[in-house]
Every structure is written in structure tokens, then in C-alpha cells.
Regions:
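C-terminal helical subdomain
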Residues: 183, 199-239
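Active-site helix of classical SDR
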Residues: 123, 159
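Substrate-binding pocket helix/loop in short-chain dehydrogenase/reductase
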Residues: 99-100, 107-112
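Conserved glycine-rich Rossmann-like NAD(P)H-binding loop of the short-chain dehydrogenase/reductase
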Residues: 30-46
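Conserved glycine-rich cofactor-binding loop
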Residues: 16-17
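Residue(s) in the substrate-gating loop at a strand-loop-helix junction
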Residues: 143
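Conserved NAD(P)H cofactor-binding loop of Rossmann-fold oxidoreductase domains
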Residues: 91-96
Length: 267
């Protein structure tokens, strides 16, 4: 069996630019065949042609708007039906950074559709197939804003908080099986998402923006290390342990039938 057949096919959403494009490059370099998904067919084919020429791997493209129900269903069916697929990178995402009152209903709906609905449905399609074969890896791209909210990130942070909770739950579901689930939580990263967010990357403090290539390389290193949660820019791994431990303690402390004493003061 060839190395490429062993590695299988990797699906990357949002593959025409940014982190997705770099993921496609790195996975092709490792020997994966690819199924690349993004809205613009011309950009997708340009990326695919470059990867075929550079690495000699098989690269398929599927132009789809994951905010559109019909397109999402097509991609979900493709992921579920192809037994060669061993890896899904759920990277596609949208960001509008503005107070809720200054965000249009269309912008709000688009973030919900792509960041939550599409990610959840594609995760469902992939994990159902992976669990049936007891093999496969799901990578969901979240954000550090999934556990920290700014005055301009209420909607975006809310969608990424879903990614955090949803993916952590999936990790519990597949524990002890041959299926792996990784949650990647980048901080500010130099990608074209900033052009649409309403906040130019140049407005961020110097030294706080990671290059996209470094972010993906760190995320893949975390995957190789077997990390459940990868924060590419956080040096002190104990911070993550403290955060997850505190969350577990808070949940444990809530498991009582009685109100907290501070709510029982008499008038």
C-alpha cells in the first residue's frame, strides 16, 4: 500500500486562502490527497493546480458556499461517502467585528451559518463515517475569542464558544476509539479574514499577530503531539490545564439541589 493510500484524503474547507490554503500545502507535502472546498472555483483550481505540480498528489476541488443549505448538503454528502477521507480540517469561518447593534442581520446570519451550522454538519458527516471505520481525524478551527469576549466580538465570540464546547464534547464521544478530534484555538493571525472583519490587521498591537504559516505549522505539530487542544501562541501549557480544571471544578460545584447561601439571606 502506498504512503498516500495509507494517509488517505484530507478535506480542507476555506482552502482558497489564509489558514486553509496553508493547511492544504502542508498536508499535500505530507503526502495526503486533497479535497479542497471554498466558494470561488477559480481560486480553488489555482491552488489545486499548484499543489498537483508541486507535490504530485491528487487534488479535487468542490466549489461551495457553506452558508447555503444546498451547497452544505453537497459537501456533507461528499465527506460521508468517500471512504478514502481520513482527515477533515473544518477551517472555513467568517468574522465581522462590531457591536451587535452595528452588525446587520445578514452579517449575523452568515456567521451563524458558517461558523456554527456548517462546522457542526460537516463534523457530523465526518465523525459518523470515521467512527464506522474506527479511523479518522477531525480538526475544528476555533479561536481564543471562544473563551474571551471583546465589546466588538459578541457574535464572533459566541460562534467560537460553540466550536469550543461542541468540539470538547466530540472528544469525549470518541475517547478510546481510533478517531481523533483536535481543537485549534489561534489568536490574531495574519490572514485575509481581517479584510472582511471591519478591523484592519494593522490596527492590532505590534507583536501580537502570528504569521499564518507559523500558526498552521504549530497546529500540525500539536496534532502530531496528540494534543486535544492546541493554542499556537500560548507558551505556558499550564494555563490551559488551569482553565480546563477550573471549568470542571465550577461544573462540579454547581451539582447541588440547594441555592447558594448568598441567595438565602432573609429580608
Amino acid at each position: 500500500m502506498s504512503e498516500q493510500a495509507t494517509l488517505g484524503t484530507a478535506v480542507v474547507t476555506g482552502a482558497s486562502a489564509g489558514l486553509g490554503k496553508i493547511y492544504a500545502d502542508r498536508l499535500a507535502r505530507r503526502g495526503h490527497d486533497l479535497l479542497l472546498v471554498a466558494r470561488r472555483a477559480d481560486l480553488l483550481e489555482e491552488v489545486a493546480a499548484g499543489l498537483r505540480a508541486k507535490y504530485g498528489v491528487k487534488v479535487q476541488t468542490l466549489a461551495a458556499d457553506l452558508a447555503a443549505a444546498g451547497d452544505l448538503e453537497r459537501v456533507s454528502k461528499a465527506v460521508a461517502a468517500d471512504p478514502s477521507i481520513t482527515l477533515l480540517i473544518n477551517n472555513a469561518g467568517l468574522s465581522t467585528l462590531a457591536p451587535v447593534a452595528l452588525t446587520t442581520s445578514a452579517q449575523l446570519q452568515s456567521m451563524l451559518d458558517v461558523n456554527i451550522n456548517a462546522l457542526a454538519h460537516l463534523s457530523h458527516a465526518a465523525l459518523t463515517a470515521f467512527k464506522a471505520r474506527n479511523r479518522g481525524t477531525l480538526v475544528n478551527i476555533g479561536s481564543v475569542l471562544g473563551f474571551y469576549t471583546l465589546p466588538i466580538s459578541s457574535i464572533y465570540s459566541g460562534t467560537k464558544a460553540f466550536v469550543v464546547a461542541f468540539t470538547r464534547g466530540l472528544q469525549e464521544e470518541v475517547a478510546g476509539t481510533g478517531v481523533k478530534v483536535q481543537l485549534v484555538l489561534p489568536a490574531a493571525t495574519a490572514t485575509d479574514i481581517w479584510e472582511l472583519s471591519g478591523v484592519p490587521v494593522s490596527a492590532l498591537a505590534e507583536g501580537t499577530v502570528m504569521q499564518a504559516e507559523e500558526c498552521v505549522d504549530a497546529a500540525l505539530a500539536g496534532l502530531d503531539l496528540g494534543e486535544a487542544i492546541t493554542l499556537p501562541s500560548v507558551n505556558d501549557a499550564a494555563l490551559l490545564t488551569g482553565f480546563t480544571d477550573a471549568s470542571a471544578k465550577l461544573f462540579g460545584a454547581s451539582q447541588t439541589s440547594k441555592p447558594a447561601a448568598r441567595y438565602l439571606a432573609t429580608a
